[in-house]
């Protein structure tokens, strides 16, 4: 007989570790499991020096958050532990974040935190404590499939769906993880928090880049990678210098504001050339990319990745967390994986994730994904074939 977490055994005989950030979502997760009779243990990770962020709203795992998590644990009558992961977090997330920006990418630190800290080290700690599962307050769902393995699904609340940030979860991790809020909406979660009498029921939601107390990510980069703040040129697609900048870390692909260039038509950041400290700008139509080269691809769909891809796999991809999935093809070419975007996408930035889904609507299944290494416009001969005109060289076909 399976319990509500789709595990063998009665709830009272099943230990579950809950990752408690001090926010309403993880607090309700702990409260729900406790109310169902599970043996719940709360763990909070201290991820960075929170002195400067103690009074900042929306910072995950800052001093106030640890205090809130402890209060919730006391309210629920569950054991609670705070683990110092500052060094691990700095080495695997913060330093990688700075390196990525310095190389001209736009990173997603929450993915790295989930992949390298929460779902690796914390999961290992949960096993050491004898837990049968690690539960989090993420808005995603996971369901047991016929063969016993688990599928990762989008949240029922599309506005809160966090599947983009969890694409790098491995199959082994997915089998151990549980997401009790996946079929709920945020208002329902807050209402449950009130019904449980939790002090965090109306607490502000946490924000990305939790380790930037001032809200200025360039402060972190200037400390760790001062060379990334070196000035350089802003150039057009033909390489003509049309302006100057104070460091490529101030820019991201698709950016329009803050260029400091007088132009008759709007200009957008098309790519960042870190080696030459150049920011390439151009018209909006030059932003549309149709091909993406991926790195560090993770596959959690059925079977082996190469067999699933075959000559080409039709799926849907999301290239930014705020965008809806779009139709695409995944192909294996010359020992690497590439995405062909059927309709093209603007502002495809190296360093962001490209996440695979099996559908557009509802609780689509997450099939995996990879990080964007490069994005390209269609080849000149493809455009010529579409327009019925002779092929012409494409200026700056390669972005990133």
Curated annotation (Swiss-Prot):
Q: Which reaction does it catalyse?
A: S-sulfanyl-L-cysteinyl-[protein] + uridine(34) in tRNA + AH2 + ATP = 2-thiouridine(34) in tRNA + L-cysteinyl-[protein] + A + AMP + diphosphate + H(+)
Which CDD domains does the UniProt record give? MnmA_TRMU-like
A single GO cellular-component term on record:
cytoplasm
Q: What class of enzyme is it?
A: transferase
**Which region ranges are annotated with the description Interaction with tRNA?**
160-162
- Extract the InterPro entries matched here: MnmA-like (IPR004506), MnmA-like_C (IPR046885), MnmA-like_central (IPR046884), MnmA-like_central_sf (IPR023382), Rossmann-like_a/b/a_fold (IPR014729)
Enzyme Commission number, as recorded: 2.8.1.13
Q: Which GO terms describe its molecular function?
A: ATP binding; tRNA binding; tRNA-uridine 2-sulfurtransferase activity
Positions of disulphide bridges: 113-210
- Matches recorded under Pfam families: tRNA_Me_trans (PF03054), tRNA_Me_trans_C (PF20258), tRNA_Me_trans_M (PF20259)
Q: Which UniProt keywords apply?
A: ATP-binding, Cytoplasm, Disulfide bond, Nucleotide-binding, RNA-binding, Transferase, tRNA processing, tRNA-binding
Q: Where along the chain is the active site annotated?
A: 113, 210
Q: Where is this site: Interaction with tRNA?
A: 138, 352
- Annotated ATP binding lies at 19-26, 45, 137
Q: Which family does it belong to?
A: Belongs to the MnmA/TRMU family.
NCBIfam families xref list: PRK00143.1, trmU
- Could you tell me what this protein is called? tRNA-specific 2-thiouridylase MnmA
Instruction: Name its species.
Output: Nitrobacter hamburgensis (strain DSM 10229 / NCIMB 13809 / X14)
Q: What gene is this protein translated from?
A: mnmA
């Amino acid at each position: 007989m399976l319990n509500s977490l789709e595990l063998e055994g009665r709830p009272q005989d099943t230990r579950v570790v809950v990752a408690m950030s001090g926010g309403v979502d993880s607090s309700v997760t702990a409260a729900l499991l406790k109310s169902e009779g599970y043996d719940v243990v709360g763990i909070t990770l201290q991820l960075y020096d929170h002195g400067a962020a103690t009074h900042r709203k929306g910072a995950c795992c800052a001093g106030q958050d640890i205090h809130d998590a402890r209060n919730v644990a006391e309210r629920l009558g569950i054991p609670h532990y705070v683990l110092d992961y500052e060094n691990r977090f700095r080495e695997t997330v913060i330093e990688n974040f700075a390196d990525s920006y310095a190389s001209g990418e736009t990173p997603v630190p929450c993915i790295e935190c989930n992949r390298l800290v929460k779902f690796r080290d914390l999961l290992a700690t949960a096993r050491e404590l004898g837990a049968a599962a690690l539960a989090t307050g993420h808005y995603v769902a996971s369901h047991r499939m016929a063969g016993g393995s688990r599928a990762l699904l989008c949240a029922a609340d599309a506005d809160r769906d966090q599947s983009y940030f969890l694409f790098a979860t491995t199959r082994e991790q997915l089998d151990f993880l549980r997401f009790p809020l996946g079929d709920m909406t945020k208002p329902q979660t807050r209402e449950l928090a009130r019904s449980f009498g939790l002090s965090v029921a109306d607490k502000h939601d946490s924000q990305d880049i939790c380790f930037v107390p001032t809200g200025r990510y360039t402060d972190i980069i200037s400390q760790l990678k001062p060379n990334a703040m070196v000035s350089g040129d802003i150039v057009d697609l033909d390489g003509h210098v049309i302006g100057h900048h104070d460091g490529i870390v101030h820019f991201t692909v698709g950016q329009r504001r803050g260029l400091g260039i007088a132009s008759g038509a709007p200009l957008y950041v098309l790519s960042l050339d870190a080696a030459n400290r150049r920011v390439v700008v151009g018209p909006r139509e030059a932003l549309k990319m149709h091909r993406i080269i991926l790195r560090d691809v993770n596959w959690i769909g059925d079977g082996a990745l190469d067999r699933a891809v075959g000559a080409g796999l039709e799926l849907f991809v999301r290239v930014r967390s705020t965008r809806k999935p779009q139709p695409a093809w995944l192909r294996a070419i010359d020992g690497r994986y590439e995405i062909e975007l059927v309709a093209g996408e603007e502002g495809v930035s190296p360093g962001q994730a490209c996440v695979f889904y099996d559908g557009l609507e509802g609780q689509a299944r997450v099939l995996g994904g990879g990080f964007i290494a490069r994005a390209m416009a269609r080849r000149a001969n493809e455009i010529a074939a579409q327009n019925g005109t002779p092929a012409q060289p494409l200026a700056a076909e390669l972005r990133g």
